[in-house]
């Protein structure tokens, strides 16, 4: 299943609607439909605006947003003259199609209304703007304790804290710290938890804090507890006495079982993927295609580069699947595309980063179709050779990512798609390249084409722990996602993209967060005129 990134709210307005009513203006309503398995399904509607040819609808349209899929939308405008919910007996004033990705990456998108393909609805236009529905605030705290009671017979306590919020007459666990072993004066790691989860968004919601001694069998011993609110926690430095109720009742001389000290407590904004995209961050998409000899002679039907009578192969299918999603987030739709592992004319030297269009000074292709065309034209002009070296292309994209990072703004993020038929040859150099790239605003997606052994690729994916170079340097973050194409060859085409792109939003946000870069503080983008509107 696709992973829902967030909920998006769409605001809709129209201009210059055609009039279908005699003696008055139309009474328009907007219907939102989504392509579900090739059929249009209605999601929601706005209210009807009476007697208006340029309505601004007050009711917003809500839709779940998924980065890793192309969500095709259709907006239909109808003149409502009766009380029935069916639209078949209402006049159609025009419609427009686009993807949700186009809307969120444009912030505001204006499209011409069409009565049918090729027939405009007069001068009518529809303008759609997107807003993310969320409370992005998080509570970030640093907490320590002093002079906690000793609970273990043969050693000191192993303390941890639990924070509970009150709701519906119950206490709900909001956060649990790590355990600090054998320490009566522990300092816990700084932590962040969403404001909504911590206190329901209310700074005065009662909070209970429990300090306990960890036992491996689960029978944790209470050290002490106290009650507070987030408002009180923010009054740093704040100290709270841990009180053990039974000890307090038994001993008149009892004071406390230690104190908990809040060193820092801040409510901060935690930016989301859409915050960055709608703030103007461009996702730069680059493609690298494997032209090594192990693919087989392209003229042979057994070759992975063989173009079927329909003009496709596994390489192109994977490219279309991933590229069709990413292209919506790049405003100029110009994508650099490279090949590697081939002997290239005119001197027939092996190259591991040659431009597919054979123009090294301008390797950009116009849209995904442009990459496909360049690939088809390059295929008969090169000699498949080897070895399979990834490092040159990774380093190539990393140089551009490093230049972007020097701006110290969340303006650009780079996604490299590598399509390959076999295990990487330059393992050490590739590991080093990935580790260096992990410090930059970029992600690497590797799709394994064919039936080779891709064990080394799984190591690059590093799901079991951080990737390390031979010298022991660890990747700053996980930026590689690998999948074998044949796992998805019998699944719908969008399934591959859903799998390989699902981690990109998290990877992008984690990088910008680590750098401390907020989304670009740009003014809302001006509405695109109909002539500029992206074509779907």
UniProtKB/Swiss-Prot annotation:
Segments forming a coiled coil: none
Subunit and partners: Homodimer; homodimerizes via its C2 domains. Interacts with p65/RELA (via N-terminus); this interaction induces proteolytic cleavage of p65/RELA subunit and inhibition of NF-kappa-B transcriptional activity. Interacts (via VWFA domain) with ACTB, CCDC22, MYCBP2, PPP5C, RDX and UBE2O.
SMART domains recorded: C2 (SM00239), VWA (SM00327)
Entry's family note: Belongs to the copine family.
Claim: Protein biosynthesis is one of the keywords in the record: no
Record: residues binding Ca(2+) 3: 152, 158, 213, 215
Residues that bind Ca(2+) 2: 21, 79, 81, 91
Primary location recorded for the protein, binned into one broad class: nucleus
Cofactor: Ca(2+)
Tissue specificity field: Expressed in liver, brain, heart, intestine, kidney and lung (at protein level).
Domain VWFA: 282-484
Domain free text: C2 domains are necessary for calcium-dependent cell membrane association. C2 domains are necessary for neuronal progenitor cell differentiation in a calcium-independent manner.
Gene Ontology CC entries for this record: cytoplasm; cytosol; membrane; nucleus; plasma membrane
SUPFAM superfamilies referenced in this protein's UniProt entry, alphabetically: C2 domain (Calcium/lipid-binding domain, CaLB), vWA-like
Positions that bind Ca(2+) 4: 152, 213, 215, 221
Biological role: Calcium-dependent phospholipid-binding protein that plays a role in calcium-mediated intracellular processes. Involved in the TNF-alpha receptor signaling pathway in a calcium-dependent manner. Exhibits calcium-dependent phospholipid binding properties. Plays a role in neuronal progenitor cell differentiation; induces neurite outgrowth via a AKT-dependent signaling cascade and calcium-independent manner. May recruit target proteins to the cell membrane in a calcium-dependent manner. May function in membrane trafficking.
Modified residues (N6-acetyllysine): 170
Listed InterPro entries: C2_dom, C2_domain_sf, C2B_Copine, Copine, Copine_C, VWF_A, vWFA_dom_sf
Protein name: Copine-1
A biological process term (GO) from this entry: negative regulation of gene expression
């Amino acid at each position: 299943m696709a992973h829902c990134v967030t909920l998006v709210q769409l605001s809709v307005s129209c201009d210059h609607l055609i009039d279908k009513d005699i003696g008055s203006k139309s009474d328009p309503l907007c219907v939102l439909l989504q392509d579900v398995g090739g059929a249009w399904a209605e999601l929601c509607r706005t209210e009807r605006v009476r007697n208006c040819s340029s309505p601004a609808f007050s009711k917003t349209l809500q839709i779940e947003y998924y980065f890793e899929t192309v969500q095709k939308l259709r907006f239909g405008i109808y003149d409502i003259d009766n009380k029935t919910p069916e639209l078949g007996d209402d006049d159609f004033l025009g419609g427009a199609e686009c993807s949700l990705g186009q809307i969120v990456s444009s912030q505001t998108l204006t499209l011409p209304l069409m009565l049918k393909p090729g027939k405009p609805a007069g001068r009518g236009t529809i303008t759609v703007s997107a807003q993310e529905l969320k409370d992005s605030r998080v509570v970030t705290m640093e907490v320590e304790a002093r002079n906690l009671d000793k609970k273990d017979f043969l050693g000191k306590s192993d303390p941890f804290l639990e924070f509970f919020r009150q709701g519906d007459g119950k206490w709900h666990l909001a956060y649990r710290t790590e355990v600090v072993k054998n320490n009566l004066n522990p300092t816990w790691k700084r932590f962040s938890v969403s404001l909504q989860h911590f206190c329901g968004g209310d700074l005065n919601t009662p909070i209970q804090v429990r300090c306990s001694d960890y036992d491996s069998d689960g029978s944790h011993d209470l050290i002490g507890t106290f009650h507070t609110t987030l408002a009180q926690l923010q009054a740093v430095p704040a100290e709270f006495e841990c009180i053990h109720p039974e000890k307090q009742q038994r001993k008149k001389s009892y004071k406390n079982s230690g104190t908990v000290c809040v060193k820092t407590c801040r409510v901060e904004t935690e930016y989301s993927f859409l915050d960055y995209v709608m703030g103007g961050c461009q996702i730069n998409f680059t493609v690298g295609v494997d032209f090594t000899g192990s693919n087989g002679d392209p003229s042979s039907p057994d070759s992975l580069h063989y173009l079927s009578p329909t003009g496709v192969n596994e390489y192109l299918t994977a490219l279309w699947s991933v590229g069709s999603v990413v292209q919506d987030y790049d405003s100029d739709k110009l994508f650099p595309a490279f090949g590697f592992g081939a002997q290239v004319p005119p001197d027939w030297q092996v190259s591991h980063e040659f431009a597919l269009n054979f123009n090294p000074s301008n390797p950009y292709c116009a849209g995904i179709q442009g990459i496909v065309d360049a690939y088809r034209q390059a295929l008969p002009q090169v000699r498949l050779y080897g070895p399979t070296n990834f490092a040159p292309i990774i380093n190539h994209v990393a140089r551009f990512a490093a230049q972007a990072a020097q701006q110290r703004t969340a303006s650009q993020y780079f996604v490299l798609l590598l399509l390959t038929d076999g295990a990487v040859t330059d393992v050490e150099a590739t590991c080093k390249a990935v580790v260096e790239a992990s410090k930059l605003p970029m992600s690497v997606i590797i799709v394994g084409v064919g039936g080779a052994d891709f064990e080394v690729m799984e190591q690059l994916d590093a799901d079991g722990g951080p990737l390390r170079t031979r010298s022991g340097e660890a990747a700053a973050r996980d930026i590689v996602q690998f999948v074998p194409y044949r796992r998805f060859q019998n699944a719908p085409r969008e399934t591959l993209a859903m799998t390989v792109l699902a981690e990109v939003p998290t990877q992008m946000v984690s990088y910008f967060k680590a750098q401390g870069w907020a989304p670009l503080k740009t003014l809302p983008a001006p509405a695109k005129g109909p002539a500029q509107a992206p074509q779907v």
